[in-house]
Amino acid sequence: MNSLAPVITIDGPSGSGKGTVAGLLARELGWKLLDSGALYRLLAFNASNHGVDLTNEELLTKLAAHLDVQFIAAEPGKLQQIILEGEDVSNVIRTETVGAGASMVASLPAVRDALLVRQREFRDVPGLIADGRDMGTVVFPDAPLKVFLTASAEERARRRYLQLKGKGEDVSLSSLLDEIRARDERDTQRAVAPLKPAADAIQLDSTELSIEQVLQRIRSEIAQRDLA
């Protein structure tokens, strides 16, 4: 960790495009990448691999503090790589089983505290792009550039629908919209680190913007701050 390394935080709700933007930006700048949303899945997956019960807060906290993980920004149009203990786990951590485990470990306060420390350890030269829901408000409140990326629930549901259909999955647009609205409510109303823009965040609505247009807006903010 290098506490002097610059950080650009990209927060926002599910389906806003923050993960895609963060990955492309990290690759473009040659900076480190943190996909904070994947950490709970990684912890649940790692715990299962090591035979640790998902209710054992003490052992989970130790695992969280020493997660050996690396995020590799992908080329345009491809998924980022997530390397855990030297193994590419990009696809296996996206299963429903791992997702359910992630929800269990995320409810444990000591685990959340340990992962907060672990997230801050990703800060290193030449810089870090941190993608999540509370990067600018909780994890890196001193970041020189904070972006809050959003889009209408309808547009986010449409994007998810096209993504899943492209994988051959049989999905309903209306059910996806219901899921996104329900998740938005949970994320914004939760007691710990609710989803909200930092007071000094640049807010971007990507509903009618392409990924390249969003990137161009962020590049402009980077140039104004002389960050890269």
From Swiss-Prot:
This is Cytidylate kinase. Belongs to the cytidylate kinase family. Type 1 subfamily. NCBIfam families: cmk. Gene3D superfamilies: P-loop containing nucleotide triphosphate hydrolases (3.40.50.300). Its EC number is 2.7.4.25. Pfam families: Cytidylate_kin. It is found in: Cytoplasm. It comes from the Bacteria. The gene is cmk. ATP binds at G12, P13, S14, G15, S16, G17, K18, G19, T20. The keyword Cytoplasm applies. The keyword rRNA processing does not apply. GO terms for molecular function: ATP binding; CMP kinase activity; dCMP kinase activity. One of its GO terms (biological process) is nucleobase-containing small molecule interconversion. Its main location: cytoplasm. It comes from Pseudomonas putida (strain GB-1). Keywords: ATP-binding, Cytoplasm, Kinase, Nucleotide-binding, Transferase. It catalyses: CMP + ATP = CDP + ADP; dCMP + ATP = dCDP + ADP. One of its GO terms (cellular component) is cytosol.
